[in-house]
Amino acid sequence: KNDFKKYRDIKNIYNLTRHFKNSNKILTHLKKIIDENSLEKIDYLKMDCEGSEGHILKSIPNDYFLKIRSIVMEFHNNVSILNHNQIIHLLSNKGYQCILNRNNNSEFGYIFATRNQ
């Protein structure tokens, strides 16, 4: 159930592609990965998705956040649909305590979010 390599090359796994650095990338919902692998609990979710973090977080159903204990993510204010304040607000509303790690006024940084389960 931990074989995520199958998502690398499958065509049409999801009907959305994103043009990035002169190549198309196949995208899928995190919900689909959780469902297909029958994941009941995720202790640690690391997200480094180069500006897609807002789309990904907004696509996760509310009840699926209950499965995720900790999220560590890189954010990109200049390209994501959600800036770091909006991400922290979203995660706080889902029951997470968030810590922001950002150098000065940089457009990117890290968010550490955890919840008691």
Predicted segments with their positions:
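Glycine-rich adenosyl-binding loop in Rossmann-like folds that engage adenosine-containing cofactors
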Residues: 1-37
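Conserved acidic-Pro-Pro-aromatic motif
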Residues: 25, 29-117
